[in-house]
Amino acid sequence: MRILWIVAVCLIGVEGNLFQFAKMINGKLGAFSVWNYISYGCYCGWGGQGTPKDATDRCCFVHDCCYGRVRGCNPKLAIYAYSFKKGNIVCGKNNGCLRDICECDRVAANCFHQNKNTYNKNYRFLSSSRCRQTSEQC
């Protein structure tokens, strides 16, 4: 399933929420940083189960939960307004659903930045067999 997410990110056009989320991550952590989070731990990438492996993986768990609360539009496809101001992500004037998606992505990108010291290369492309514990509730 994670491979499908990678393909989806690669195939998405110049706009679209996943592309915008990738730009937020790269803006906070540097060019091409998004590739470090596409398949990481138990929650970064498509789907998720088990217990987050570290603070970085927990950022993805919280992001998944946030997307799960969004109502009224598709979080992975909707296009929202945002910008960077003095290194900070600022969500623009969006309606309720788009505002919620932007906030989910902004919080996750900031979380990755705040927890970059917990990033563990051993959790990249982690086998799903290492994520079989009972999943936490959002």
UniProtKB/Swiss-Prot annotation:
Active site, renumbered: H63, D105
Residues holding Ca(2+): Y43, G45, G47, D64
Protein's cellular compartments: Secreted
Cofactors (names): Ca(2+)
Summary of activators and inhibitors of this protein: Enzymatic activity and neurotoxicity are inhibited by Triton X-100. Triton X-100 has been determined to be located in the center of the hydrophobic channel of the enzyme.
SUPFAM superfamilies membership: Phospholipase A2, PLA2
Signal peptide: 1-16
InterPro entries (UniProt xref): PLipase_A2, PLipase_A2_Asp_AS, PLipase_A2_dom, PLipase_A2_dom_sf, PLipase_A2_His_AS
Assembly notes: Heterodimer of an acidic and a basic chain; non-covalently linked. The toxic basic protein has phospholipase A2 activity (chain HDP-2P) and the non-toxic acidic protein functions as its inhibitor (chain HPD-1I (AC A4VBF0)).
Protein name: Basic phospholipase A2 chain HDP-2P
Record organism: Vipera nikolskii
